A protein has these predicted regions:
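Acidic, polar-rich low-complexity tracts and alpha-helical solenoid repeat scaffolds
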Residues: 1-155
Length: 155
């Protein structure tokens, strides 16, 4: 580790791992859930999405009170979205309300309604939640532009 440079690709991975450990592995009881999450991350990097889903599903079923569960639901929603399992993606995205990932869940919900369901009105309602309730979100400006684009298209 002493020879690790800032430009080394492993540096970002180590910083991300440090943040995960600090945030989600504060108690010894969190060890198992953290282990399943890290295993799922490895599967995601290997593009073994089915295996990642199994690990994450087990995590959320077995450790519902674990601090990392909301992040697991986000990963589940994103994987299901990528696999075009929109019903499952929506189910997990809706579980992100009142978590630190609520804005991402709302945006994903809006995307599902817009892209899959072709329900522009409901997707706009979701996007407007970001504009009204999540002004601090890094996604605020891109969502604002997207809403404007949709409204121009619908006019």
């Amino acid at each position: 580790f002493n020879d690790l440079e800032f430009s080394d690709p492993s540096f970002n991975d180590l910083m991300e791992l440090k943040n995960l450990i600090t945030k989600y592995y504060s108690e010894p009881a969190d060890y198992s859930s953290f282990k399943y999450f890290q295993k799922s991350e490895l599967f995601i990097r290997q593009k073994k999405l089915g295996d990642a889903l199994k690990e994450l599903e087990y995590l959320v079923a077995s450790f519902p009170e674990s601090p990392i569960t909301s992040l697991a639901h986000l990963r589940l929603a994103m994987i299901h979205f990528r696999l075009e399992n929109y019903t499952n993606a929506l189910s997990h995205a809706l579980l992100l309300d009142n978590t630190e990932f609520a804005d991402k869940g709302i945006i994903l919900t809006g995307q599902i309604y817009e892209i899959q369901e072709k329900n522009i009105e409901t997707s706009l309602e979701q996007y407007m939640k970001i504009l009204n309730d999540f002004t601090y979100s890094i996604y605020y400006e891109p969502i604002r532009y997207h809403v404007r684009k949709i409204q121009k298209t619908e006019s």
